[in-house]
């Protein structure tokens, strides 16, 4: 699942990596052209692909339109943050990516700082990046996000203390749950780093570490 994703028909090609990649590429290109470019009346397919590649590479990492625009500009493609905002909205409207905002757990308010993005399918991410071994930790984090979304939770990134955050604050039926996700916590310092944000939360809602 981490490598191939969850499109039902794609399971026919688990033993044929080329056919699997071609199938996912067909879905990807159809979404970009019909659901992103045509529906939103956008003109720059190269920019859309650049943004999709950037978001796929930075799944689970804080990003902003300005940060992306600066990166594109430094790579020789001058782009304004307003343009990036428009194209990012188109990618999320097409449900190719999901935007997750940050939430101050103590202050109980949404923050206007950098958001995180998660892709709709891990197989698509691997196809876009051309690899199946790109940052397993964020792959697992992406999978947990999609499962929480499937179960009907409203999801935010939680600020739990000074310089610390919880991967997911999941709310459903007026009940809150907190989730930390890590590829491995065998190292004691990693375990402590993952548990610290949960320990800083003073309420009695359930808190989970998934690894």
Each language-model region and where it sits:
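Accessory nucleic acid-recognition modules appended to NTPase machines
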Residues: 7, 12-175
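Serine/threonine-rich low-complexity intrinsically disordered regions
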Residues: 3, 15-16, 187
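Active-site donor-binding loop signature of nucleotide-sugar glycosyltransferases
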Residues: 122, 181-183
